[in-house]
C-alpha cells in the first residue's frame, strides 16, 4: 500500500470509531433538555451536564494530546470508545446530577482523544489532506444522522432512556474500527511554559465555535421552535440530523475544493459568505439563511486541520491541532450562554451581525498572518 492509501485507511477507521461513539452525545443534547425529569435533574442541571464535556476538554485537552502522542492511536481510541459505551450505559441506567456528571466528564476526554485522532491521521500525509479529512468528517456524521431520527421516534414509544441501551451496542461496534488503527506513537514537542496569546487561527476557531456551534444552533432552536408542525422531539431531532447530513454530503466536496484552490483561500471565501448568511439569519430570512449556513459550515469543516498541519509540521502538529480544538470549545461554550442571555432581550439583527463581522475579520487575518 502507498503512504496515501494507508493514510486514507487509517483516517477512515479513526472516523468510524468516533462516528459510532458520537450518537451517545448528540442524543443527550436532544433528549436531556426535553426530558430532564426522566434523568432526575432540573433544567439548570441539564444545562451544566451538557456543558461539562466541553469544559473538561478546555482544561484537559493538553493532557489528552500528550498521552495520545505517547501511546498512539490504537490504545487511545480503544480506551475512548470503551468510555463512550460506558457513558451510554450509564445514561440508560443511572439518574441524578451527581451520577451523570462523571459520565459527562469522561465522555469529554474520550471525545478529545477520538477527535484528535481523526485530525492527526487525516493530515499525517500532506498530499490530499483536505480531501481525506473532509471524507472522514462524512464518516463521523453518519452515526448521528442515523441515530437522531431513530432516537426521537424510539423516545416517543419507549421513553428517553431506552435508546441509550441501543447506543451502547453501537459504541462497542466502534472497537472493531479502533483495533485496526496504528499503535505507533506520535512525536511530541517540547512543553511550552507560560501564557501564549491566541494567534489568528485561534481567534477564528473561537469565533467559529461562538457563531456556528453556539449562537446559530441555539437561535435555530429558539426562533424556529414554533415554525414546524409535529412533535417537538421529532422536529428537534430532524433539525439536528440535517446538520450532520450536510457534513456527509458536503464535507468531502469542501475538502476537494481546498486541495484544488488552497485551504486558506477557501477559508476566507466561505467565512465571508457565512458572515453574510448570519446577517440575513438575524434580519428575518430565517429558513433560507439557516440552510445556507448549514451548507457553508459543512464546506468549512475540512479546512482548518490541513492549514494547521501545513503551518505546524513535525512534532508540534498534534499539540497545534489540540490548541485549535480548545479555542473552538471555548467559543462553543460561550455561544449558548450568550444566546440564552441576549435572544430574549436584544434585537436579533445585532446579535448575529456583530459576530458575523468579527468572523469575517478573523478569516482575513488568518491569510494575512500566513504571508
Predicted regions and their residues:
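Pair of pore-lining "gating" transmembrane helices in MFS-fold secondary transporters
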Residues: 6-34, 197-216, 291
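Short amphipathic helix-loop junctions that connect adjacent transmembrane helices
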Residues: 31-44, 218-234
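Central cavity-lining transmembrane alpha-helices of secondary-active solute carriers
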Residues: 48-65, 238-253
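Conserved MFS/SLC helix-loop-helix module at the cytosolic interface between two early adjacent transmembrane helices
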Residues: 59-92, 258-264
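C-terminal ends and interior cores of transmembrane alpha-helices
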Residues: 82-95, 272-283
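Cytoplasmic helix-loop-helix junction between adjacent transmembrane helices
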Residues: 105-140
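Intracellular juxtamembrane helix-capping segments at the cytosolic ends
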Residues: 113-126, 299-313
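C-terminal transmembrane helical hairpin of 12-TM major facilitator-type secondary transporters
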Residues: 264-304
Amino acid at each position: 500500500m502507498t503512504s496515501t492509501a494507508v493514510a486514507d485507511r487509517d483516517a477512515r477507521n479513526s472516523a468510524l470509531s468516533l462516528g459510532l461513539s458520537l450518537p451517545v452525545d448528540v442524543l443527550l443534547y436532544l433528549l436531556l433538555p426535553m426530558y430532564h425529569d426522566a434523568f432526575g435533574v432540573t433544567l439548570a442541571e441539564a444545562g451544566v451536564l451538557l456543558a461539562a464535556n466541553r469544559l473538561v476538554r478546555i482544561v484537559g485537552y493538553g493532557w489528552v494530546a500528550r498521552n495520545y502522542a505517547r501511546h498512539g492511536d490504537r490504545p487511545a481510541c480503544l480506551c475512548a470508545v470503551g468510555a463512550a459505551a460506558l457513558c451510554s450505559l450509564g445514561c440508560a441506567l443511572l439518574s441524578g446530577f451527581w451520577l451523570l456528571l462523571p459520565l459527562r466528564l469522561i465522555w469529554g476526554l474520550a471525545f478529545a482523544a477520538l477527535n484528535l485522532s481523526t485530525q492527526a491521521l487525516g493530515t499525517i500525509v500532506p498530499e490530499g489532506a483536505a480531501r481525506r479529512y473532509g471524507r472522514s468528517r462524512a464518516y463521523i456524521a453518519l452515526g448521528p444522522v442515523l441515530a437522531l431520527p431513530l432516537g426521537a421516534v424510539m423516545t416517543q414509544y419507549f421513553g428517553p432512556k431506552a435508546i441509550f441501551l441501543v447506543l451502547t451496542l453501537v459504541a462497542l461496534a466502534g472497537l472493531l474500527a479502533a483495533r485496526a488503527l496504528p499503535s505507533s506513537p506520535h512525536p511530541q514537542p517540547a512543553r511550552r511554559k507560560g501564557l501564549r496569546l491566541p494567534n489568528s487561527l485561534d481567534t477564528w476557531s473561537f469565533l467559529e465555535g461562538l457563531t456556528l456551534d453556539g449562537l446559530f444552533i441555539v437561535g435555530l432552536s429558539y426562533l424556529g421552535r414554533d415554525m414546524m408542525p409535529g412533535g417537538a422531539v421529532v422536529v428537534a431531532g430532524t433539525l439536528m440530523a440535517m446538520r450532520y447530513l450536510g457534513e456527509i454530503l458536503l464535507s468531502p466536496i469542501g475538502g476537494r475544493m481546498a486541495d484544488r484552490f488552497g485551504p486558506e483561500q477557501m477559508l476566507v471565501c466561505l467565512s465571508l459568505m457565512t458572515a453574510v448568511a448570519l446577517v440575513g439569519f438575524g434580519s428575518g430570512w430565517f429558513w433560507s439563511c439557516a440552510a445556507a449556513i448549514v451548507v457553508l459550515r459543512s464546506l468549512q469543516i475540512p479546512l482548518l486541520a490541513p492549514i494547521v498541519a501545513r503551518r505546524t509540521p513535525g512534532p508540534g502538529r498534534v499539540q497545534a491541532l489540540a490548541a485549535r480544538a480548545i479555542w473552538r470549545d471555548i467559543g462553543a461554550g460561550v455561544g449558548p450562554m450568550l444566546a440564552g442571555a441576549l435572544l430574549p432581550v436584544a434585537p436579533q439583527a445585532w446579535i448575529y451581525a456583530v459576530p458575523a463581522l468579527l468572523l469575517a475579520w478573523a478569516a482575513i487575518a488568518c491569510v494575512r498572518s500566513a504571508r
